[in-house]
UniProtKB/Swiss-Prot annotation:
Recorded name of the encoding gene: nrfA
Cofactor: Ca(2+); heme c
Binding note for cofactor: Binds 1 Ca(2+) ion per monomer. Binds 5 heme c groups covalently per monomer.
The EC number(s) this enzyme carries: 1.7.2.2
Pathway: Nitrogen metabolism; nitrate reduction (assimilation)
Residues reported to bind heme c 4: 312, 315-316, 423
Protein name: Cytochrome c-552
Binding of heme c 3, residues: 124, 239, 242-243
SUPFAM superfamilies per the UniProt record, alphabetical: Multiheme cytochromes
Molecular function per GO: calcium ion binding; heme binding; iron ion binding; nitrite reductase (cytochrome, ammonia-forming) activity
Binding-site positions, heme c 5: 305, 344, 347-348
Catalytic reactions on record: 6 Fe(III)-[cytochrome c] + NH4(+) + 2 H2O = 6 Fe(II)-[cytochrome c] + nitrite + 8 H(+)
Subcellular location field: Periplasm
Entries under NCBIfam families matching the protein: cyto_c552_HCOOH (TIGR03152), PRK11125.1 (NF008339)
Length: 510
């Protein structure tokens, strides 16, 4: 009966929420006294966040014998088809801003760099360019300036495993992002997936390799040791170089995958809670937040394709036939529908149009419930702010803030990924659904706290209908950020490229 009562008011609240962000608070108050009168003595107290105690991570020493050739342009002549299709990822030029498309995210990430600038992904060719230009990396004018650590380069370039081999993990991670500007200059390319210095590679064989030590360690945690995996698992694991959930551990800010308990949203959440890890404290609600990255490998493994051995490569890098009749792997990683006959049609009997309609429908359904969760979270953050302003104590707030943390972690797990609506739509819907439950739990608890401090009227939400309004509501001076970045791109980045050419890491200017 208790659970049934809660489900009743949650479903009703969600219908109101899609119409008006203020009405839901009032609706929630009315139902609260009906439902909680019967269950007050039966409520379960959830464990609150522990003090941060980072797990000590292995640190790989320098390995001078590991040779990594990170310059993509050196392989243009030997592998012209592969190189040209890789270069064709430059045709993916759109830089649509999620912040402008959906200003709610500015509130959800308030106090974190993603609130300033978050764009939809484009081709691997732009990996280095985009991380330089994004407002999130700020405008460090000297090598020692912050705020970002060296770890922020880790997914962007084959220069990263080269530097780790040369310096060791402590030497690589223990530096600022700005200090790597003239070293990390080649975008995601050949040496990220292949042993480009090996005899096998020279003879035209794939020579698949993962050279980032932290990735190899993570794969072992889930019994996917790369060296002993079969070819299918190895091909998929290459994408785990980057398309995974991770965090920066300890003072070293070492890239670490939270896979000790498994790869599900609950398993990773437990890992973070057990060690008390917090990405940032929310600027509005003061909740101890987690920021999901892009758990694509995890959702793929949990979905129908992963369970049936259909890998990332099968769908995004198919075998195609060149004009000379020879078959090669297409390196223009992108939408499988762009190469339908070589990807989807290998397994599916449906027409391209029918499959596209099915995928579009799933995407729309997931987006709809995701936006409902965003609305709940936006309201929860501002209701928490109102509770603090009314005099709430840390003890009174801790359970509601923990619910906000868990709810937004689930939203972000679904939102941050690429293609989850096709990789594992059932997984995403479940994740978002439990996020809605937890956001409702948070708001229920906040109503009690607000009432205890004399707040019985609905909490008025600020106008966040545009990105500019949302930045204003959360205290972001976006024009100041843009001006600083423009100066950085004008003065610092050209110097980085000049130094990289002097080191031989980039080809000479033509």
């Amino acid at each position: 009966m208790v659970v049934f009562l809660f489900i009743l008011y949650r479903q009703s609240d969600l219908k109101f929420k899609s119409m008006n962000g203020v009405i839901i608070v009032n609706t929630l108050k009315k139902r609260l006294f009906v439902a909680t009168t019967m269950i007050w003595g039966l409520s379960v107290t959830l464990p609150v966040l522990a003090e941060y105690k980072p797990i000590e991570q292995p640190v790989e020493p320098a390995n001078p014998s590991l040779k990594i050739e990170s310059r993509n342009d050196l392989f243009k002549e030997k592998y012209p088809k592969q190189y040209q299709t890789w270069a064709d990822t430059s045709k993916s030029t759109d830089l649509d801003s999620v912040n402008y498309e959906d200003p709610r995210v500015i509130v959800l990430w308030a106090g974190y760099a993603f609130a300033k600038d978050y764009k939809k992904p484009r081709g691997h060719f732009y990996a280095v360019t985009d991380v330089r230009e994004i407002l999130r990396t700020a405008a460090p004018m000297t090598p020692d300036a912050g705020p970002m650590p060296m770890a922020c380069w880790s997914c962007k370039s084959p220069d990263v495993p080269r530097l780790i081999a040369e310096r060791g993990e402590a030497g690589y991670f223990g530096a600022t992002w700005a200090s790597g500007g003239s070293e990390v200059v080649n975008p995601i390319g050949c040496a990220d997936c292949h042993d480009t210095t090996s005899k096998d590679f020279a003879e035209g064989k794939p020579a698949l390799r993962i050279a980032r030590p932290y990735v190899l360690r993570a794969l072992e945690k889930i019994d996917h040791k790369f060296d002993t995996s079969d070819r299918t698992d190895q091909r998929a694991a290459l994408c785990a170089n980057c398309h995974v959930e991770y965090y920066f551990a300890g003072d070293l800010k070492q890239v670490t995958f939270p896979w000790d308990n498994g790869i599900t949203v609950d398993a990773m959440e437990k890992y973070y809670d057990d060690i008390g890890f917090v990405d940032w404290t929310h600027a509005v609600s003061k909740a101890p937040m987690l920021k999901a990255q892009h758990p694509d490998y995890e959702t793929w493994m949990l979905g129908v394709h992963g369970k049936n051995g259909v890998t990332c490569i099968d769908c995004h890098m198919p075998k195609v036939q060149g004009a000379d009749g020879k078959v090669y792997t297409d390196h223009q990683i992108g939408n499988p529908f762009n190469a339908f006959e070589h990807t989807c049609a290998n397994c599916h009997d449906q027409s391209k149009e029918k499959l596209q309609a099915m995928v579009k429908s799933r995407k729309t359904e997931i987006k709809d419930v995701m936006l409902r969760l965003e609305d709940q979270l936006v309201a929860a953050h501002f209701e928490a702010k109102a509770a603090w302003e009314a005099g709430a104590t840390k003890e009174e707030m801790k359970e509601a803030l923990q619910d906000i943390r868990h709810a937004q972690w689930r939203w972000d797990y679904a939102a941050a990924g690429h293609g989850g609506h096709i990789h594992a739509p059932d997984v995403l819907l479940k994740v978002i659904g439990t996020g809605l439950d937890k956001s409702s739990d948070a708001r229920t608890k906040l109503v009690r706290v607000l009432a205890k401090h004399g707040i019985t009227d609905p909490v008025q939400l600020p106008d966040i209908s545009t990105a500019e309004n949302a930045w204003k509501a959360t205290g972001v001076d976006i024009e100041k950020e843009r001006k600083a970045k423009a100066e950085f791109l004008k003065t610092v980045v050209p110097q980085w490229d000049k130094e990289a050419r002097e080191k031989g890491l980039l080809p000479a200017e033509k």
